[in-house]
Amino acid sequence: MSANSNGSAVRWFHERGAENIGVAGGKGANLAALARAGLPVPRGFVVTTAAYRDLVESPQIRDAINRLDALDAADTDVLAAVAAELRSLLESREFSASVETTITDAMTSFESTDSFAVRSSATAEDLPSASFAGQHETFLGVASDDVLDRVCDCMASLFTDRAVAYRARNGISHADTEMAVVIQPMVDAAAAGVLFTADPATGNRHVSAVDAGFGLGESIVAGDVTPDHALVNTRTDEVLEYTVGTKTIAVELHRDSAAGERTRGREIEESQPAEAGGTRRIELSANRRESRVLTDDQLRTLVGLGERAETLLGAPQDVEWALTDGQFVLLQSRPITSLFPRPSPPPVDGRLHVYVSMGHMQAMPEAMPPLVRDVWRTYTGNALSSAGLDASFGNPTVEAGGRVFIDVTSFLRHPKLQSWLIDRIAAINEPISTGLAAIVSRRPEEFAFRGVTVGALPGYVETTGRLVRLIGPAAPGIVRNILGALAGRGPTPDDESWTRMGDLFVGQVTDAPTPEARARAVFEAIDFRRFFRDVYPRISPLFLAFALGGWLTRTFSEQPTDVNAIGRGFERDVVTRINLGLGDLADVARAHPQVASALRDGASLADLEDVDGGETFREAFNDFLDEFGHRGTGEIDLSRPRWREDPSMLLAVVRANLANEAAGDHRDRIRRLVDDAEAAAARLEAYADHGLLGPLRRRYVRWLIRTYRDTVYFREYPKQEAARAFTAWRTVLLDAGGLLVDEGQLDRPDDVWYLRKDELFDALDGGCVDVDIAARRQEHARNVDMDAPPVVTSEGEAVRGQVDRGPVPEGALVGTGVSSGVVEGAARVIRDPTAATVEPGEILVAPSTDPGWTPLFLNATGLVSEVGGAVSHGALVAREYGLPAVVSVPEATKRIRTGQRIRLDGTRGTVDLLDEPLATTDEAHVKRPKTDSHGVD
């Protein structure tokens, strides 16, 4: 089939339609758009997708492409085999005569002595969601007579192993993806490099980053030199930073005439014979290596071109540029796909705003689907409204990357609240605290307190009144319960107030008369006035416990091990009860050998029905689920199943206990912790008993320790009851999804998670669901793959503060020590707690931990987590079990591998990698993919 039957095989950049991705591919379309807008793009044309269709029009090739689409992304060997078959088929193909003539005719528009850049341009590359950088071929310095062959090679590179695997992982159809090819004369560049119109290291959309080197950009793209690196503020044109790199070589076009003199270097390698054009590598003189490539004025000019490209193409751009004859030209432009999305909606006041990740605060930083985000945004808004703070916050929450962020700008703009927030949040998540401190220190003008204006006075009066009305009724109960705790009359596990608290949360949803009303009630579930009046007094002794814990830590700063010990060994603690319950289940299985054998062989609960002793085990298991079946991993994400729905993780823990422990070991462990706590308390009392007032101090410390232990053990009880509410909300919303399935509005009940709140309400009121659920599922999957920052600004900057741990071993990872002690062992990296177990003696390495991870702590000897703080769940459990722990370790699950030996110091907050660590990406400097000798793009 001739290309002309479907469209021209060639489109020049200036021609209408060349900016169409379906015609010119991503790279070609972007260059055409820039050229048509008047930006400096070297003259060139695109061999279009019509030519690609001409090349692949063969039943054998189409069959192989369809076979690729039918394969699973995990079948890498089969994918590679079919891809190799396709490349072989394409290498034996030729363009039709009409297509070949069209391309060769276009080439006559250039000088015969020109050499060319031949760049692949797939229809699925250089898109906002998928860049395909480094997946397809690019050839530089190509002689005119070889262009046609290189075009065929570029089209065949659509099926390189890496390109096929990338499309398969990202759910992109191979049959729907086509290849165009960009043809341009090579630019004889004095300098070249890469411009990022947003800083890729921080995400700041108002800072551009430039890498620059002498000669062609190939040396930078290939990673062969350390380029100059500059940062420019695009609002003020200020050059914020210019670092001169060590540029040992330059790559230049091969010219017979005085090329060495122009570069003032020595030729060290010739990539192609002189008569074929091509490039060569030049070794630069010592002075040249250390000299600046670009002046400040040149930087500003280049950044201005980048801003125009970003505005035209609608997203921050990764631009390859060259400087020739004193003028900049743009060689390529594609979206920066690695940036974390900018928070939305933007601030209404036009000023800098700072947002804190709700997920990081809850030790659950993963993305959540749209409806779940709406639940928590509504919840936060209602809480602020009840406190009278809604007017002060504007949009109290924003979204970015499938996460909810809380606007803390109002706190940071107040001199007293600023320090209070930064100090208090340090115990929850140290990176958030240091991030807030860093942005306040770096941008003080944004957080200057401007006083209370006359116009704002009514708002302050209203806020004060609401706070008094909200907290006032709770004050007597708070005082009464704290005094009761101090007198030894603290809450007990049998106190019905705990279940009443859960009943309050659950009943506000389940008591509604209809499924529609119950779904709406989820978004109104917390009556904050009633919460403060009835619930806050019950949990107030917990604040006393935290205060006493802080006092003990400060007073006995030289005895951290003993202070940690008195905070564990509680049989009544929720976490301990969960683990004791799982251990008891293993003992039940041991008492029935056939059950134990079946479980070791991977039996499910249903499989045990006909096994001798199986019913006894099932009854015990159901008793456990009656108490804890509403728990699960990532509990604040209502879309995730609970243990009652999917008990496979619990059964895996029981299997591990059967394999690695004897009967009663789990209860012996708790008894040892109780004994350790009593011994530690005695030692702390002895430390206090010195001098004339020693006996009095001893009694005082004994009283404080008793009060601390009588109150701190119930720290997980509020979460236990809150999780009951979350499960009720989940059930109600899934029921609403089922209702919409019955009406033909949704395909599956869990599609409901991909609706927005207003869309759900409209559908329940009889409206039509006009939503692309599949697209939202794909967007959610992309969000899940992103690493979210704990602090982000309205400018898109991911703010990271520095934690000073003093001298640390080279290569050590630094985080926050939350449970003292040192342990050395093999790492077990787990990202999904439902699909893995920890073997005895291993150190658990996780992205985050919440109550759903609790069973995995049974066999662990230490914890490393990417997220968390001193009072996060993982820290509490680690201290309860006496495990050294370091949290808030950036990229821990990427930089540590399973089986690697590590040394964990929970006192200093460091993790030493004792085996050779895996290579990692340097966050401070982003490098482009390394290329083959002919270039890969």
Locations of the language-model features?
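N-terminal beta-alpha lobe that positions the nucleotide/phosphoryl donor
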Residues: 1-182, 191, 288-311, 506-509, ...
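Cysteine-dependent phosphatase catalytic core of the protein tyrosine phosphatase
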Residues: 223, 298, 305-373, 550, ...
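Extended active-site and interfacial segments that coordinate phosphate-rich ligands
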Residues: 133-166, 189-270, 331-387, 862-864, ...
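Intrinsically disordered, low-complexity terminal tails and inter-domain linkers enriched
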Residues: 255-280, 918-936
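N-terminal, non-catalytic alpha-helical interaction modules of very large eukaryotic scaffold proteins
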Residues: 341-713, 717, 728
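Acidic, glycine-rich flexible loop/linker segments
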Residues: 58-62, 302-305, 316-317, 325-341, ...
